[in-house]
Amino acid sequence: LHYPLRRQRQMCIRDRNSPIRVGCAGRTDAGVHATNQIVEFSTNSHRDMKAWVYGTNSHLPESISVNCGAIVPNNFSARHSAFSRRYLYVIYNSPIRSALLPEYLHREHRRLDHEKMDEAAQFLVGEKDFTSFRASKCQSSTAMRNVLSVEVSRQCDLILVDITANAFLLHMVRNIVGVLLDVGAGEKPISWPRLLLTFKDRTKASKTAPPNGLFLVGVRYETAIHIDMPDLVWPHFLGLQH
């Protein structure tokens, strides 16, 4: 969650008796989107859930919308209770720019082979050291992350990179996409991601993909924590089924 948005949410969810602090499931860079961000807060106020949802939305800008709400256990943490997070990166593979959705797509003019990209992405599945895929300013104490699945598919001129992991490093998804773009364009071999994992050197990898094509689409929690909310929400313009 970008800091200005976090502050804005705190201002919109106000309790007359005490200040409210919010926590979120995943932090997003400026320019990155979230269709299924989970935000939690504690309050002594008693309102029905419809009042919380509609009341909060009445104070939010059009770029932010609360979809639903739920009561959770006192020990629930949107961030630390999460079992996995799922991101989707949307690539518009065309030599001509899109005039309608430039803020929600990354246009790639090179013709991409999505099957090669998908094959290359499978080298990233599993618990591995993602030093080559983390930003230089990443403050995480370890580069070990467990990627549960990666799938690259094509829908006409759109290429979708769907990736799920227990957690992500700073710019990790965008750096992975940057590598897959070079593989799809034929400028790097399919084995390129595997080699980068062994190098453990960010400077040897591809350029970081822009933020505008990236969406946080899902957060899953342990089965012991029951939350009556969807764990996956696709961007509406894709027309995909949840």
Features from the language model and the residues they span:
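Single conserved hydrophobic/aromatic residue that forms the stacking wall/gate
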Residues: 1-13
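Structured-RNA-binding interfaces characteristic of tRNA pseudouridine synthases
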Residues: 10, 14-242
